[in-house]
Structures are given as structure tokens and as C-alpha cells.
Amino acid sequence: QQSEYFFDYSLLFIVLFLLGFGLIMIYSASSYEAYDTYGDAAFYMKKQLVANIIGLVGMIIIANIPYHFWERFAMLGYVVSMILIFLVKTPLGISSHGATRWIGIPHTGFNLQPAEVAKLCMILFLASLVCKMGKSVRTMKGFFIMMGAPLPIAACVYLITDNLSSAIIIMGIAVLMVFVASPDYKKFVIMGLSVVAAAALLVFVVVQLGDKIGGKFRLARIQAWLNPESQAQDKGFQTLQALYAIGSGGIWGKGLGQSMQKLSFLPEAQNDMIFSIICEELGLFGAVAIILMFIMLLWRMMVIANNAPDLFGAMLVVGVMGHIAIQAILNIAVVTNSIPNTGISLPFISYGGSSALFLLAEIGLVLSVARRIQLKEL
């Protein structure tokens, strides 16, 4: 009987490959800093390995639980996400690099990032909401309800944890899920044009203000994006070092472990900027290979979403697909200076325990949906 059901080994293999590759690149990118700071070249890699193992165990457990089990916790997840975000402002809050975005879990040594919890819970909540609203999601009222639901969470993530990139991802997930549930192109064309117009206006204002920006952090980042050389010792330093890494890698790269920029030149080499180290050590070939792996991952999710047994399963997979796609695109765009630096990790590859745990939980949900697909439906 079980053989009549589908299990996506291709999806599982791609995820395992990205995790394994990520561990190799984290070791390569962080070994110098880790040895200099902690006396152990594999310090960051070991911590990530532990997070990956815990995440994989969680993924397997979630994959074997019927995904409808989680629907009853959708509203609870929304509330818990909000509470966790506010806990950042309590003594439990952990600061790093000038931002307080983590909660310290007592007696564990683990720091939890509430924004990662919010992304997963928002996918669950919106998938449940789409099913409850039914055809009314296609009305203008339904559209505003769906787009308004994630706004409080996204606003709190931005205002309380100062995490613009996660707020953008949460709203991006909502836009994609609403679009799939209600493919009314006019609303989304208008929304897209409005966002582009607002972004263009913001860039114009930054260009006109010039040196008057002063201490306004976000606007200063946009100015550094437009002309990183003018702030080579300040906001533009990380971007320039990342571009040097990408440019020096050429087509085939310098070779694994041969990066120069990781030698304390490039800040956050093992985290937000790990793609630039991939480009430096493995060249354009390595960068394209990783992008193709992400495309294959998204394609497998699209196949699962198209064949999901019901709407809730399909919307879960669409939400996870949107999360990974948006985050990967934003990370690569930041590293290549296509958009202003927002501080965002590369899924499955960058260093970060919270990100790995909750991304693997999302993959568990996708595999759970895939397991309920009957082979005769494919």
C-alpha cells in the first residue's frame, strides 16, 4: 500500500547536498576567524553541524506527521510569533553587530531568532486562512484581509528587531500565496508598479540629499549601494570586499580554501556574504552550479504543489517555495550589489542555527505533503 504513495527523494537529495556544501563553505570561509577568535578552525562549522542534525531529525519527524495536524495550530503560531518578537526587548534579548534580533534560550547556549519562527508560522497561518476564506479570497475584501494579516508581524519584525529583510520576506511570502490563491493580475500589477515607484522615489530622494543623510541608517545604506567607493571605509566596505571576492574568482575560482577575502577582509564571510566566497573559491562555475541547485529545489516544490491532495497542502508548499526563493534571490542580489545591503542569509548554506532549524522544518512540511500524493495522480 505504501508503495502506491510518492516520496520525493530528489527534493531530499538537493536539500542534503546544499546542507553538506554549506558546511564545507562555512569551514572554508570561517576557519581563519574561528581559529583566531576561538582557537578552533572548525568552531562555526561544528555549531552549524549540530543545528543541521537537529533540524534533519525535526524534518524527518514532521515529514511523517500528516500536514493537516498543524492546521489547528495556525492561529496559535501567529500569536506565539508576536510574543517571541516582543521578548527581544526583554533581558532575554541578545545583541550582535549593533542589532538585537535574538532570544537567548537559558542553559542551552542556543540563540533563537523570532523572525525565523514568524516566517514558518506565517506560512501555516496564511495557508489555513486561504482554506477558510474559500472563494471570497478572490474578492477585493478578501485580498485586503489576506494582505493585512501578515502586516502586524512584518511591522513588528522591522520595528522591534530592526530586521527589514525578514519583514520583506514575510510580506513577499504573503504576496505569492495570495497570488496563487487568487490570480488576479490587475491587483498585483498595480501593487508591483506602486512598489517600484516608491523605491524609485526613495532612491531619488537619497541622491538629492547626498551628504545631508548623516546618521539615518537605512538611507545611508542606499547611498552606499549607489556609490560604495564613496564610503569605502564605512557602509560600503563590506559590499566592496564582496565584489573584490567575486571579481577575483574568475570563471573557475582560486580553489577551495584559497580565498583571500576571508582573511579578516570581508565581514560576515561565513554568514550573509558566503556567496562571494563561493564565487572567489569556485568561480562563476561554482556560483552557477549553486543557483541551478536552488532552481531544481524550487522546481521539485512546484511539482509537489501542483499535485498536492488539497488546497491546504498546495498553499503550504507554495509558501515554503516563496520563502526560499525570495531569500536566495535577495541574498545573491545583496552580495552582487544589485540591491542595498539588508543583511540576509543564503538558505541552507550560510551560518545560522535558527535559519537551518526552521528551513528544515519547512522542508519537513513539504515532504509531508509529498507523501500524501498518490502515484496515480502524477
Regions found by a protein language model. Give the residues of each.
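A juxtamembrane structural motif centered on a specific transmembrane helix
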Residues: Q1, Y5, Q327-L378
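Short clusters of hydrophobic/aromatic residues that line enzyme substrate/ligand-binding pockets
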Residues: I103, L112, V137, I251-W252, ...
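TM-adjacent membrane-interface loops and short helices in multi-pass inner/ER membrane proteins
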Residues: A224-N271, F285-G286
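Transmembrane helices with small-residue packing motifs
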Residues: Y32-E33
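Hydrophobic alpha-helical transmembrane segments of multi-pass inner membrane proteins, especially
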Residues: L16-G20, S28, Y38-K235, S276-N337, ...
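Transmembrane helix boundary and interhelical junction motifs in multipass membrane proteins
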Residues: N163-I168, K254-S259, A269-N271, V288, ...
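N-terminal membrane topogenic signal
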Residues: Q2-V15, W70
